Amino acid sequence: MVSRLQLTVEVTVKLLMLRTATGEVNLSEFLVETRLAGFDGIEGPIPANPAARKELRQQLQDNGLVLIAESTTGSDLTASDWWIPRPERTVPDHLEDLRLVAERAVEVGALFVNTMCGRDSWAWSEQVDFFGEALELEQQIGIPISFETHRSRSLFNPWITRDLLQIFPTMQITCDFSHWCVVCERLLDSEWPILELCAQRTLHVQCRVGYAQHAQVSDPRAPEFQEALLAHERWWDLIWQSQLQRGFSQVTMTPEFLHDGYMQLLPYTGAPVADVWEINCWMAQRQRQRFVQQYSAG
């Protein structure tokens, strides 16, 4: 049984550990399990139905949990590969998808919006148009928007991310470095100046561990993946240091080991080679301990 994440040492900045949500059927059971496992909230999509949004907000309050709203723009949410942006969806389409989620995020009291947005194949002018308009939308609606580093999306590699951050000084990002490890086919220490820039603009971290051939190691506890785990932790430390320097009163992190093609399966049987929930709880506990050790007030 996974133990509760119990750490009582006071820290100068609070680390909120979020559980990833993927549209669970029984919201009440999911949130109770989340709370009992020691997580501070969830990161996931917001229901389109107004009554369901009202229920979500109430149940989050009842359980003392926070929410990061997930936006996936330009996709077909009914498709099996719902996370992939469709080629026929235009910049205005992506912006409209983002606007809808941002408005709903305000309604349910989310901390901010995390968005997988844009498309990797867009021309540079389309990328610039999208992010310029998205940042204006952020100001209009009045909720922070954090743009996620993700394959198939605008921020699919370190270099385009660097270039966009240099153009848009108020742009904040969600760093999921596991995707870049696959795109670049290596760990990212060779791109340290870009990692430093990203750290200075990071609002949120998704702490999955990737490596050169896959966006998710099968089990970060295994010794064969220690190099990749320690590399990601170096990069997350860089982000934490920047967030403290920028005066954050709380920082957020989501362990995001997933199924949906991320978790390796045994041939023929299709059985997962490790337990995703167990790994996410282990990762949450490990990162919370590391955070307290580095930033304790005592």
Protein language model regions, located:
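Histidine-acidic metal/acid-base catalytic patches
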Residues: 2-5, 28, 167-171, 182-298
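Hydrophobic faces of well-ordered beta-strands that scaffold small-molecule active sites
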Residues: 5-19, 42-44, 65-72, 113-115, ...
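Active-site-proximal loop/turn and secondary-structure-junction residues that shape catalytic pockets
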Residues: 17, 46-48, 73-76, 117-121, ...
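Distinct, well-ordered alpha-helical segments
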Residues: 27-31, 53-58, 124-133, 153-169, ...
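Alpha-helix-loop-beta-strand connector modules within alpha/beta enzyme cores
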Residues: 57-76, 131-142, 167-168, 233-237, ...
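Surface-exposed, active-site-proximal loop segments in enzymatic domains
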Residues: 75-95, 119-126, 216-226, 262-272
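Active-site acidic/histidine proton-transfer and metal-coordination neighborhood
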Residues: 83-172
